[in-house]
Amino acid sequence: MKKKNWIYALIVTLIIIIAIVSMIFFVQTKYGDQSEKGSQSVSNKNNKIHIAIVNEDQPTTYNGKKVELGQAFIKRLANEKNYKFETVTRNVAESGLKNGGYQVMIVIPENFSKLAMQLDAKTPSKISLQYKTAVGQKEEVAKNTEKVVSNVLNDFNKNLVEIYLTSIIDNLHNAQKNVGAIMTREHGVNSKFSNYLLNPINDFPELFTDTLVNSISANKDITKWFQTYNKSLLSANSDTFRVNTDYNVSTLIEKQNSLFDEHNTAMDKMLQDYKSQKDSVELDNYINALKQMDSQIDQQSSMQDTGKEEYKQTVKENLDKLREIIQSQESPFSKGMIEDYRKQLTESLQDELANNKDLQDALNSIKMNNAQFAENLEKQLHDDIVKEPDTDTTFIYNMSKQDFIAAGLNEGEANKYEAIVKEAKRYKNEYNLKKPLAEHINLTDYDNQVAQDTSSLINDGVKVQRTETIKSNDINQLTVATDPHFNFEGDIKINGKKYDIKDQSVQLDTSNKEYKVEVNGVAKLKKDAEKDFLKDKTMHLQLLFGQANRQDEPNDKKATSVVDVTLNHNLDGRLSKDALSQQLSALSRFDAHYKMYTDTKGREDKPFDNKRLIDMMVDQVINDMESFKDDKVAVLHQIDSMEENSDKLIDDILNNKKNTTKNKEDISKLIDQLENVKKTFAEEPQEPKIDKGKNDEFNTMSSNLDKEISRISEKSTQLLSDTQESKSIADSVSGQLNQVDNNVNKLHATGRALGVRANDLNRQMAKNDKDNELFAKEFKKVLQNSKDGDRQNQALKAFMSNPVQKKNLENVLANNGNTDVISPTLFVLLMYLLSMITAYIFYSYERAKGQMNFIKDDYSSKNHLWNNVITSGVIGTTGLVEGLIVGLIAMNKFHVLAGYRAKFILMVILTMMVFVLINTYLLRQVKSIGMFLMIAALGLYFVAMNNLKAAGQGVTNKISPLSYIDNMFFNYLNAEHPIGLVLVILTVLVIIGFVLNMFIKHFKKERLI
């Protein structure tokens, strides 16, 4: 057992020795080179000092111009040849300071440009250009670094002073130009005032004078007109126009007499025609003809039974005779004759096809045409697939079925066009196999070029317009139901009353029996409803007119009036882009060409088969010769079929007794009707009596009207004369009033023009005042704070003479002359190795002596837990003591300033406790695997240190736990980040390590875990 323990101890010791030697070699190589570089940088003057520039400046605006002094500062440094400058991010600069890549980091703050342009401020804020030097620099290198920063800052301050002087001169120059502009604007205002207002106002009274003259003339004419009109009215006698309404005028009487005579004459003529009807109709002839037809039908019916057998016998004899003639016919071609004819015909056709030059030329022409057609078809397929630069729209995208569905096609169409795309890919592969690499073709990549676009529906929407007229006696309510996928804007007018387009119920005026409905609005698609809308691509709006609160009675058969005015807009056309139709057209065109290509493929070089053509022609002729016997048999079969169907045919012709009987009955009825008509014509018609004496009453009606009509005519003539005179006066008045109206319109137009000009002039004057006020305000700011009372503003003077100050972002380390400062990397490595040794000591003791039991388990069942707590406490206390010792040594070695020492020692103690507790737990619990994990963490740290680059942290640095501890100490020593969160995390890790050591599970059998 002891031998086995010594073997473990020896292995661990060798591993620790190898790790320490490797660490010393690595540190000597890395940091010795850095120290050597530091010494060489002193000897090689300033060009070996690497300076990292971190530009955090944000642009600002001054006098309407964009100012970026941070960029100007960097450009200034780019011309500097004595030092090596690099513009990097803050993280890269800090990493460079840590690993020796940079000696100085200069930070241009965020408000650098804003603070630098404080020429108008009374007390300008100080501008600080921040810088930081690397930890552990030699005193001579640090002095050179300070000198470099000072020189760069002095040069930049000189440039800023030049910028300030240029800005002041520009302000004065702008003021000079603005004064000239003010004078020009004032001159323009005066000129416009004269032309726009002064001259038109001087001409304005003339318009009033013309209007007054025309008004006086019109007033005189109106007075004369009314006087004449009154005179005519006063001289007229109202009795003159009164007519006795008991009588009609003579013209009415004459018209009535004429109409009476016409009707009387028509009546006489009708009576004469009625009397002569019986003489003009020959009914006896019609009746005799029908009776003769009836007798013939009787004879035909009696002959049907005797003629049927004769028909059958005649048909049978004719068919038998025809059958004998056909059976007697024999084929003129014997079998030997047919074979000889086959042989001779074959030889003749072969000779004709072989020696026919026209046929050979035709075959060659067909072959050439097929080759040319195949070449043209292949070129067309190439053009269908490939997209030519700029102008070509007939090409094929490499689209899938899902792409077609997303573009708006249904599943059936998507399957169809997906198959065409696969054909295009198949042809592309065949084409590329035949062509060199430079001529290969490919389908155009698809990137949603033909996807559905709903932006126009979301932004512009779709117009909703409808006009209807609804008539009903019982409609009293309107219900509006809108599409939930759209936002509606607009209104619904019902008999002129407006209602918003939204989901609502509106009570209508029941006094109206007719409703004029006008819908006018816009429906815009909701962004969150785009997916649901694309399922049917239809906008719905329903207006339902009906009755509210109607209760139907059981016996009420009157239906409820409901009028549904529904607007359905299919918006599929608003979704598809032109690219979709172009793509589908290109696919259809390729499909047609490809089918032609597959039909003609493989037939171009196939020779013409003469033998097959000859055999086909000879076989056709021989078949015709041999088919004589078969044709004869077929004809005989047809004759037999005719004989079988002859009885039925004769029965159909002769057995029509029912139709004959019906015709006989109809003829008998017609004869009876004609007999009745004949009796009616034989009777004498009764002549109506007409009283012609009534016409005498109209002859006495016009005698009393002649005198009154004459008197009315005279007065009408006089009234017409007065009216004509009144009309001429009215025309004159109308002309005068029109002139007055024109003058008023001129006054109105002139006044309106004057108002517009006055408003324009007022706006221009207001704009000029605003520009002048702005200039005065801005010019007032120029150097307004250049003096403080009667004295010069010393703060502004000091700022403009030396605007930018340098600010050292001091480290927590004290400068100790030429003494080298230990690196945080070496410090962390030493702490970790010390914790590994401590953990192994605890593990070896427990392995040799067993678990530490400070309290015997016999006294209480909980003593085992107390022993675990005490064991964890001993391990943690050991880490605390080691951390205190290491912290005191490192504090003196790092020369930490007085205000930072307590936090530094606390960080070291917590870090050391974490290392000791975690490493001890790994060895106690998982033994060899724990040792492997500890060494793996150490190896990751070595790799991270070796691969550390100025460009940032690598992947190894991110997964290495020790790298985070290293960064923690580096940031603290450089006073970059607060450590409050770091202390909390370390405390939590200490508690976790303490608890883990309390619950160690001991296995009964020794085994490798």
UniProtKB/Swiss-Prot annotation:
Residues 680-697 have a biased composition (Basic and acidic residues). It comes from the Bacteria. Its main location: membrane. InterPro entries: T7SS_ABC-Transporter (IPR051328), T7SS_EsaA (IPR023838). The keyword tRNA processing does not apply. One of its GO terms (cellular component) is plasma membrane. It is a multi-pass membrane protein. The chain crosses the membrane at residues 7-27, 822-842, 869-889, 903-923, 928-948, 979-999. One of its GO terms (molecular function) is identical protein binding. Residues 680-707 are annotated as: Disordered. It is found in: Cell membrane. Keywords: Cell membrane, Membrane, Transmembrane, Transmembrane helix, Virulence. Component of the type VII secretion system (Ess). Provides together with EssB and other components such as EssC and EssE a secretion platform across the cytoplasmic membrane in the host. Belongs to the EsaA family. PANTHER family: TRANSPORT PERMEASE PROTEIN, TRANSPORT PERMEASE YVFS-RELATED. Homodimer. Interacts with EssB. This is Type VII secretion system accessory factor EsaA. It comes from Staphylococcus aureus (strain Newman).
